[in-house]
């Protein structure tokens, strides 16, 4: 299992292969990662991804879909690579595909219940006035010089995070300021991002439907500082 996944990572590093977690955008030869979601399990969409041309499906082993999965995949000439944590698999593949682990861009994360958007906007202005080319990923928009788009999520999924970081670097951006939500930390959306620094604005009662209690909420926020990789 580890050897098969390592081969996928190497294929992504070489380029020429795309990674998807949405079966609706899968194309011929893509890698589809069946990520378990809050409301839907990505494993449900494996047949659709295979039909769309996925060359490889990454999913959890031992799931109820295994028997039907193996039959349909083999019939279509696709193969299955198992991973105990598809969310981890997704960000590792994204990091390999876009080579963000070797990025020279300084990436700063801002987390907290309130004040993330204000803080990132202030940092954007400060770094811009200091002569830097700045990119921002946040609640209002994803933007950098020459590009701006509306933000459907405060922190996008790993494929979007890593692809946009690569686009920013290619555009000459040297500082990125990113809003990091607690949902994003919990769902591994910013794992593999080589943060150079981070800021914690505050912690007040919010999102307890997701985190259950304030202690869990705090521990999730703290992971940005305790667990995520750091640039040297």
Which residues fall in each region the model found?
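Phosphate-binding loop of NTP-binding sites
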Residues: 88-232
């Amino acid at each position: 299992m580890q050897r098969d996944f390592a081969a996928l990572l190497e294929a992504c590093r070489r380029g020429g292969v795309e990674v998807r977690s949405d079966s609706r955008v899968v194309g011929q030869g893509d890698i589809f990662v069946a990520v378990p979601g809050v409301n839907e399990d990505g494993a449900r969409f494996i047949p659709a991804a295979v039909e769309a041309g996925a060359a490889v499906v990454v999913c959890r082993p031992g799931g109820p879909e295994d028997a039907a999965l193996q039959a349909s995949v083999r019939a279509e000439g696709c193969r299955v690579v198992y991973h105990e944590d598809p969310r981890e698999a997704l960000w590792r593949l994204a990091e390999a595909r876009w080579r963000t682990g070797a990025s020279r861009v300084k990436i700063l994360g801002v987390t907290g219940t309130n004040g993330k958007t204000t803080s990132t906007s202030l940092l954007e202005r400060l770094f811009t006035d200091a002569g830097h080319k700045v990119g921002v990923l946040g609640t209002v928009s994803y933007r950098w010089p020459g590009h701006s788009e509306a933000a459907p999520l405060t922190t996008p999924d790993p494929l979007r995070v890593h692809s946009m970081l690569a686009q920013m670097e290619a555009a000459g951006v040297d500082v990125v300021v990113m809003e990091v939500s607690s949902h994003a930390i919990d769902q591994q959306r910013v794992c593999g991002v080589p943060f150079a620094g981070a800021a914690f604005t505050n912690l007040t009662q919010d999102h307890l439907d997701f985190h259950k209690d304030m202690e869990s909420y705090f521990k999730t926020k703290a992971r940005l500082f305790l667990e995520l990789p750091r640039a040297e």
